[in-house]
Amino acid sequence: MSIPAFTVVIPARLASTRLPNKPLADIGGHPMIVRVAERAHASSAQRTVVATDAPAVAEACAAHGIDAVLTRADHPSGTDRLAEVAAQLALPDDAIVVNVQGDEPLIDPQLIDDVAMHLAHHADCAIATAAHALHDVAEVFNPNVVKVVCDAGGRALYFSRAPIPWSRDDWAGVPAVPASAAQVPLPAMPVLRHIGLYAYRAGFLRRFPTMAAAPLEQTEALEQLRAMWHGERIAVLETAAAPAPGVDTAADLERVRALWAQGMAQEGP
């Protein structure tokens, strides 16, 4: 199967608690949101659109020839924002929309293509996403690292901040919250870390805002659990390696700037 037609939507908000004005942070002479859009343009997407509630972000995009749409500021989640964009663009129900986070300036364009293709290959699923095996046990027990377990067909069974699956034999005697993960072995069965890249069918995006919030979604603070609670299937693409780091904090921004500078230096004469 050839790569399906798809649209990339990049949500971008200025109101970040840990890094204010994050979409406009400079990376190599351009705002971060522009760098993310450049990576999306390098994929096979037919169109890339930035979705923002901030005129300053829309203006920065326009200055660099990037499509942007203004959305409401009161959306409870990024998926709700995507639903508004899908409606504004009048996308048909079977159209594929890939949600690329606005703080991923180093995202691999091939991964964007792969997730879109994965959804196209799973006609029974409304959503596709990605995951990779963890090799650091500290990340297994880190609640900020979301884990996913899948069925035999690679469809998500559950997402959690807890270490899942719990390896009874490998972790015999290990408390659920160990004082230190340094002495805890990696289990025989791989633990998969969820990668926050999603492909959706536009019809699902139209349904999502009408779905009642789910207790599991609220408990784990993971909006994909709302979809699963209401019976939607999620296809999970397992990748061989972790993606490039995103930007959540000022320290992350400096690290990405350094990586970007190294890449630009390697490309130079």
Curated annotation (Swiss-Prot):
What keywords is this UniProt entry annotated with? Cytoplasm, Lipopolysaccharide biosynthesis, Nucleotidyltransferase, Transferase
Say yes or no: keyword Iron present: no
**What GO molecular function annotations does the UniProt record carry, in alphabetical order?**
3-deoxy-manno-octulosonate cytidylyltransferase activity
| Catalytic activity of the protein | 3-deoxy-alpha-D-manno-oct-2-ulosonate + CTP = CMP-3-deoxy-beta-D-manno-octulosonate + diphosphate
Q: What is its EC number?
A: 2.7.7.38
Per the UniProt record, one Pfam family is CTP_transf_3
**Per the UniProt entry, what are the Gene Ontology biological process annotations, in alphabetical order?**
CMP-keto-3-deoxy-D-manno-octulosonic acid biosynthetic process; lipopolysaccharide biosynthetic process
Q: What does this protein do?
A: Activates KDO (a required 8-carbon sugar) for incorporation into bacterial lipopolysaccharide in Gram-negative bacteria.
The family this protein is said to belong to: Belongs to the KdsB family.
Which NCBIfam families does this entry report, sorted A to Z? Answer: kdsB, PRK05450.1-5, PRK13368.1
| This protein's name | 3-deoxy-manno-octulosonate cytidylyltransferase
> What's the name of its gene?
kdsB
